[in-house]
């Protein structure tokens, strides 16, 4: 049961002798599980690594993780009360930690650590590492509100150094008057409509593709790694995303070897909602659509939306007529996608098919799409797991326990 800790992002590593290990970040937990999945029908937990002292940093989570070039790189950061059960005043550690897994994949050795500089902040969220010298982060930063784009040089993994950063101008709080920007943002819904990088910053060649909440897709030229420059943008919010939804633009994934990119708006977790919540207050009523979008990036200075992904097929035996109102007694919830599979060129053990998109929805399971024709997208298959019986940490659950 993964030591009683629910996994979040997972990274697969293939050893030189053909074994497979899954390194699991934690949605609510201060460390990483190491799972031997060489026999995928018999996964076995073989180690647990702690990122910090949980007594000193009780609010720390390890949500995101990357593996490449014999390194495991894990992110740490804080949580929010309604998602993670963190209590006011709980301390958290915002960092990136680098481990050697080539020498001993079961017992990763800590090589170096880098801290964001923000005390008890959100820390590092999604990030990109395809091997090599640089790690591309979505992370908080002193003097800014919300996560910005930060670039680390890890040529010496024992001493990571920040070498570049980029942000939307209104994130630079030292340039604004107090009251012009959200304070303690992650605890307040208005922060969801403030520019910030969700990530990961997906890098192909000298271009970085950023999923920037209400700012949509932003494309940067990073040929000078120390001075990223904006060259293109496509906003998606309005008509897409808003109100009770999650990250307004969650992921922007270029399809391998193609001039197309898939962007997503994040839905939200239905267990945290019910009819009363959805029909009262300033965010009540019809919820904007959250979806997967196909974007033409053949001209990075002029990205254009060219197609929408189809609504997930509803199983014949599903207890509700659709996923938007599932378990909500007729009210509409913020249904939509969450994570998509991220193929990377330096990770050949991952599926690299440029004509497939794998997406996990909130309570609609994993969906597999054929995108060989970018204008006529077809759903090929789906898997919806059983609903959970309980949560592994203490938070209010006013809505239905849906997977």
Question: Positions of the model-derived regions?
Answer:
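Feature marking well-ordered beta-strand scaffolds used for ligand recognition
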Residues: 1-403
